[in-house]
Regions:
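Beta-propeller domains
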Residues: 1-60
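A detector of repeated loop/turn-to-beta-strand junctions in beta-rich toroidal repeat architectures
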Residues: 7, 56-58, 70, 111-116
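Short loop/turn segments immediately following beta-strands, especially the blade-tip
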Residues: 12-21, 61-69, 119-131
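Beta-propeller fold detector
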Residues: 21-29, 71-77, 119, 128-141
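Beta-rich, blade/repeat-based domains predominating
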Residues: 29-47, 79-89, 140-153
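Entry beta-strands of beta-propeller and related beta-repeat scaffolds
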Residues: 49, 92-96
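Short, conserved, GDST-rich strand-edge loop motifs in beta-rich repeat architectures
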Residues: 97-117
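Sequence/structural signature of beta-propeller modules
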Residues: 129-170
Length: 170
């Protein structure tokens, strides 16, 4: 999957009969309002696709169990702007940051909703905020991206051998 910023579309890139193809499979919000999709995250089981749109501050969830016909099943406003999303492998914890580019970032808005890091839990029906940092209030600069460290992602893929960690080939 990929998104197009100014036309606000989701495209599927797939292989068929030994040829790569692409096709538009969904619109994201009202394209005339330029929601500006900036980040996507696919669940570990490849069934769900999260799409963040910076201009309206929303995250949208699509059921992509049939990748040729996704269905939007959820949306939530995360802040006045939203940029990156990172999710845990079990799909229960989500981390959002807000800064796209310093010169483009909004300068006015709700307290705590312009420059932030926010953590949420997903229960299968709603995102519930569990933690947040207002980067303006804390004078921390512009939060662009947050990712899990390699140990958190790949802890099960390591084997101790002579007291050294070795990545296993699969």
């Amino acid at each position: 999957f990929t998104t197009t910023a100014l036309t606000s579309e989701i495209w599927l890139i797939y292989e068929e009969e030994n040829q790569w193809k692409s096709k538009k499979i969904a619109d994201i919000g009202d394209a005339s309002k330029i929601p500006l999709p900036v980040d996507i995250s696919i669940s570990a089981d490849d069934q769900l696709l999260w799409v963040n749109t910076w201009n309206d501050g929303e995250t949208r969830l699509y059921d992509v169990s049939n990748p040729h016909a996704p269905k939007q099943i959820f949306n939530k406003k995360i802040g006045d702007q939203v940029n990156m999303v990172s999710q845990s492998w079990d799909g229960k914890r989500f981390y959002y940051t807000s800064s796209l580019l310093g010169n483009w970032d909004k300068k006015t808005g709700s307290k705590g909703d312009l420059q932030y890091f926010k953590a949420f839990t997903w229960d299968g029906a709603d995102l519930t905020q569990t933690f947040g940092i207002d980067f303006i209030e804390a004078k921390l600069g512009l939060p662009h991206q947050m990712r899990f460290g390699a140990k958190a992602l790949y802890a099960n893929l390591y084997s101790k051998q002579n007291d050294k960690r070795v990545a296993l080939s699969r």
